[in-house]
């Protein structure tokens, strides 16, 4: 894993941390319990059938949902997070707000393309 990919994965994991993250470690599905920064690197504490301490990001892959798996109900809910305002020319503009990105994180959608980069795995139905 190159430094750019490592940074992208760390940013993604940190933004999803409050919502719970299931990751693959070796051949096990485990949950991220804690993310720590020490001596210039990030370390993860993971729990499953046992607790794993000091795991480097290179050893894990989060389970994420492709945007294409969004249900019609989820799409409607997601649209409610958009912000709209009128500019000085009277044109109404709609954009993704912080709440939109937070919603995607909370629902474990892969909006950064991590699955295509082989940095994440596609979540199974009803995994989250």
Regions found by a protein language model. Name each.
Residues 1-128:
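Structural boundary micro-motifs
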């Amino acid at each position: 894993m190159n430094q750019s990919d490592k940074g992208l994965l760390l940013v993604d994991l940190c933004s999803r941390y409050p919502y719970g993250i299931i990751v693959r470690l070796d051949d096990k599905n485990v949950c991220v319990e804690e993310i720590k920064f020490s001596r210039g690197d990030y370390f993860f504490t993971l729990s499953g059938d046992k607790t794993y301490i000091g795991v480097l990001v290179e050893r894990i892959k989060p389970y994420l949902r492709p945007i294409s798996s969004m249900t019609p109900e989820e799409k409607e809910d997601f649209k409610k997070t958009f912000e709209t305002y009128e500019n000085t020319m009277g044109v109404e503009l709609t954009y993704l707000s912080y709440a939109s990105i937070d919603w995607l994180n909370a629902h474990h959608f892969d909006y950064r393309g991590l699955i295509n980069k082989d940095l994440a795995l596609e979540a199974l139905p009803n995994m989250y």
